[in-house]
């Protein structure tokens, strides 16, 4: 007996292929969908480079659909991808931030827009090949990391709504990558040993600076400064830098220097290693998953992860106006505006909430005040 229809987002990789195969074995009527998000036109992209969502990946996804004997469709998502991912990517760099396009893509395209397409077809359920699980915390749903510690992808999924979480399934959450490849071989899938892409899909050369140049973005030149306001050099564009960066500065100094702030006027503030640690920072555009929205002034302890592959640390968060103020209780460096911060309970691995790191921390704000005094004197 059929369990009903389900849409599987098929990228052309082994993970989504096995997801489709497993759901078929469970009795679902699987419909494969590939999301065409990006027009691969020269000279912006070199299609000979390996990246996800490429024409090669679409062909691989279609081949898997034929092998599994399931309906397969390519759905055009270029417009929403341009608005929600690429335009934001460019805007963030133009404002001194370091964007996280994979988070935006998951939130607005792979789940947001795909769910809308599914509902238009009268289908409630979708599935993807993410290594994640869904748990319940009381009346709320939340993402939890998968069992494969090398593939934990909860960080990229904090933007999913409660409605999304009720209707999505992740069949690979309880598996490891080697196990998934072995299942693909058993199923006779052509992508069983296909290499993974590590690049942003619309930047196959993994060079965002070249991408910005080809999109005719005007870089904002300025000065390299120390925290006390001293000018120690010039640069050709703040878009070339990110918080925590050490290489490629071209500044000779007695000790290694790191980017610790990027200013609105184009100034790039440099400091030594001990100046890279955040005292506090704020988070905006918060989405709550396993935790009910905080009231004004409410506060509690949890753990925060400030980038992918970062080990979560203890912190205290407080709701202030529309923002969350985060006070780390352990040392953390490289807190980067534009990147995502996600929060977990102290003793569990499911997501409480997440949001975008806003520019500045208390430590950096103090530095700005000191710099202003230095310039006035």
Swiss-Prot record:
The keyword Nucleus does not apply. HAMAP family: tRNA_thiouridyl_MnmA. It is found in: Cytoplasm. InterPro entries: MnmA-like, MnmA-like_C, MnmA-like_central, MnmA-like_central_sf, Rossmann-like_a/b/a_fold. It comes from the Bacteria. This is tRNA-specific 2-thiouridylase MnmA. Belongs to the MnmA/TRMU family. It comes from Leptospira borgpetersenii serovar Hardjo-bovis (strain JB197). GO terms for cellular component: cytoplasm. Its EC number is 2.8.1.13. The record marks 130, 339 as: Interaction with tRNA. Keywords: ATP-binding, Cytoplasm, Disulfide bond, Nucleotide-binding, RNA-binding, Transferase, tRNA processing, tRNA-binding. The lineage of its organism: Bacteria, Pseudomonadati, Spirochaetota, Spirochaetia, Leptospirales. ATP binds at residues 9-16, 35, 129.
């Amino acid at each position: 007996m059929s369990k009903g229809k389900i849409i599987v987002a098929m990228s052309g990789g082994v993970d989504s292929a096995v997801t489709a195969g497993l759901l078929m074995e469970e009795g679902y009527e699987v419909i494969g969908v590939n999301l065409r998000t990006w027009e691969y036109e020269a000279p912006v992209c070199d299609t000979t480079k390996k990246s996800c969502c490429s024409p090669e990946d679409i062909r691989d996804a279609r081949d898997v659909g034929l092998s599994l004997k399931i309906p397969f469709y390519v759905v055009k998502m270029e417009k929403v991808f341009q608005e929600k991912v690429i335009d934001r990517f460019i805007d963030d760099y133009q404002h001194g931030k370091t964007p996280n396009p994979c988070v935006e893509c998951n939130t607005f395209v792979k789940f947001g827009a795909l769910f809308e397409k599914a509902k238009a077809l009268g289908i409630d359920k979708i599935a993807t090949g993410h290594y994640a699980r869904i748990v319940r915390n009381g009346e709320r749903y939340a993402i939890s990391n998968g069992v494969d510690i090398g593939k934990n992808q909860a960080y990229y999924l904090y933007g999913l709504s409660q409605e999304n979480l009720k209707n999505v399934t992740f069949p690979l959450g309880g598996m490891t990558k080697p196990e998934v490849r072995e299942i693909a071989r058993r199923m006779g899938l052509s992508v069983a040993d296909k290499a993974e892409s590590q690049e942003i899909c619309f930047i196959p050369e993994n060079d965002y600076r070249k991408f910005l140049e080809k999109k005719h973005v005007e870089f904002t030149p300025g000065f390299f400064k120390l925290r006390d306001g001293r000018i120690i050099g010039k640069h050709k564009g703040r878009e070339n830098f990110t918080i925590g960066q050490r290489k490629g500065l071209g500044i000779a100094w007695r000790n290694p220097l790191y980017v610790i702030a990027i200013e609105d006027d184009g100034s790039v503030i440099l400091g030594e290693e001990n100046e890279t640690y955040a005292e506090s920072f704020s988070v905006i555009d918060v989405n709550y998953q396993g935790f009910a929205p905080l009231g004004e002034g409410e506060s509690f302890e949890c753990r925060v992860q400030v980038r992918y592959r970062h080990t979560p640390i203890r912190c205290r968060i407080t709701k202030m106006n529309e923002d969350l103020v985060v006070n780390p209780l352990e040392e953390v460096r490289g807190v980067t505006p534009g990147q995502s911060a996600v929060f977990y309970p102290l003793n569990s691995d499911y997501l409480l909430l997440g949001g975008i790191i806003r520019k500045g921390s208390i430590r950096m704000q103090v530095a700005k005040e000191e710099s202003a005094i230095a310039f006035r004197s």
